[in-house]
Amino acid sequence: MQTRNAFSWLKKQITRSISVSLMIYILTRTSISSAYPIFAQQGYENPREATGRIVCANCHLANKPVEIEVPQAVLPDTVFEAVVRIPYDMQLKQVLANGKRGGLNVGAVLILPEGFELAPPDRISPEMKEKIGNLSFQSYRPNKKNILVIGPVPGQKYSEITFPILSPDPATKKDVRFLKYPIYVGGNRGRGQIYPDGSKSNNTVYNATAAGIVSKIIRKEKGGYEITIADASDGRQVVDIIPPGPELLVSEGESIKFDQPLTSNPNVGGFGQGDAEIVFQDPLRAQGLLFFLASVILAQIFLVLKKKQFEKVQLAEMNF
C-alpha cells in the first residue's frame, strides 16, 4: 500500500513537472516569436509600402542610418554578397523589456528583385560562410523568396550582416530580364517604441493623459510608477501607468499640462532604410563587350606598329 502511494505521488510530481515545463516552453516560444522582424511578417503582406516606406518604421520611430553594398553587376546563376551595415555606438545600452539595461540587438530586411533569392548552403564558399557566421536568414513569406529578413541578433557581433544571394538563371526562369534593378534595405538597432497593436513599449517617452496636479506617485515593487493626476476644475482623477525603464521627470504637487512628458525618452536605437542598384548582366553581352575592347586594343597596337614601320621607311629614304 505504501509503495502504491509512493508511486502515485511520484506520478503526480512527474506530470506536474511536465506541465510546468510545457508552459514555460510555450511562454518562451511566444516571447521569441513576437520579436522583430516577426511583427512585420505577421502584420504586412509586403514590407515595402507603395510610398517606398518600409513598414519597420511604424514601430521604430527614430531615424538612423543604414548602408548597403552590392556588386555593380552580376551574371546569371552566380552567388554574390549583399553587405548591410547598421552603424551605432557600441557603448550604448538600451532599456530591456524588464526595465534593465542591456546591449542593442539589430535586424534587417532585404528586398531583392524578383528571381533573386537566398543562396543554398552548398553554393556558398567557405570565405563567405566565415563572413556570415551563425546567422540564420529566412524568407519574408514562402512565396516571396526575394525578400529576406534577419534578427534580432546581437549588435555587438552583427552590426555588419552579409547576405549570400543567388542570382536567377534565365534558362529556368523565363520571366527574368537582363536589366538594372533596385535593391531596398531596412535596418534597425534597438527595440521599437510601438507594438503592432498600437500600444507603447517601455522604450519610449510617456506623456500625461490629462492636465492637472500630480497628487500621488506610487513606485511599483517590480519597477515603474502609478501617477495620479487630479484635475483642479472638476476634481476628476486620472492614473497614468509607467512601465519599468523610462526615468520619471515629474514630482508630487507639480502642475502639468495635457500631453506633457512624464518621463525621459530612453530610446537609443532607431531604423533606417536605403537602396542600391545592380545590373543583371547578359553573359553574351559581356563577351561581346570584351571582344570589342580586345579588338580596339589590337587595332591600337597595329596602328602603332604601322606608324613605326612608316617612320622607318621615311628615315631610310632620307638616308638614301
Curated annotation (Swiss-Prot):
Sequence intervals crossing the membrane: 286-306
Cofactor binding annotation: Binds 1 heme group covalently.
Signal peptide segment: 1-35
Pfam families: Apocytochr_F_C, Apocytochr_F_N
GO-annotated molecular function: electron transfer activity; heme binding; iron ion binding
Entry similarity comment: Belongs to the cytochrome f family.
Name by which UniProt lists this protein: Cytochrome f
Species the sequence originates in: Nicotiana tomentosiformis
Gene name in the database record: petA
